[in-house]
Amino acid sequence: MTLHSTIDRVTDRIIARSEATRRPYLDRMEAARAKGPARAHLSCSGQAHAYAASGEDKDRLATTSAGNLGIVTTYNDMLSAHQPFERYPDLIREAVRAAGGTAQVAGGVPAMCDGVTQGEAGMELSLFSRDVIALAASVALSHNTFDAAVYLGVCDKIVPGLVIAAQAF
């Protein structure tokens, strides 16, 4: 794909400007890639716990040649914007399975809407919900069983929290 020349120039400037601060991140990602799938380094009991509820994917998970995708979701029944995420994990599992990999829901993160809580006691929780969401997503992915992750979320508080977590996992 050919980039528009302005976008190409801006991208090059951003890469050059952020080179020093981005280097530690790139080094960390390269070290993780060179180390191989994290789940290969788990203890037998750790792997047993991680795969126990995986049904037909257990055998595939036990091999480190098949990628395992972690799914972090903000699905809940109360907020209409999140409701479509109810079916996404099954759809993602099917697509990943068809491609030869596995996918597991790593965890759910809290999701709130300040439009619902405005004027209510507790509405100030939205001010630090990004940090809580980032921490919750990090906890969900801390089991070292995933080769990649997909984050299902919407909203100006939730997506930044998920992006913060994505920078570490």
Label each residue range with its predicted role.
Residues 1-169:
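Metallocofactor- and cofactor-centric catalytic cores in central/energy metabolism, strongly enriched
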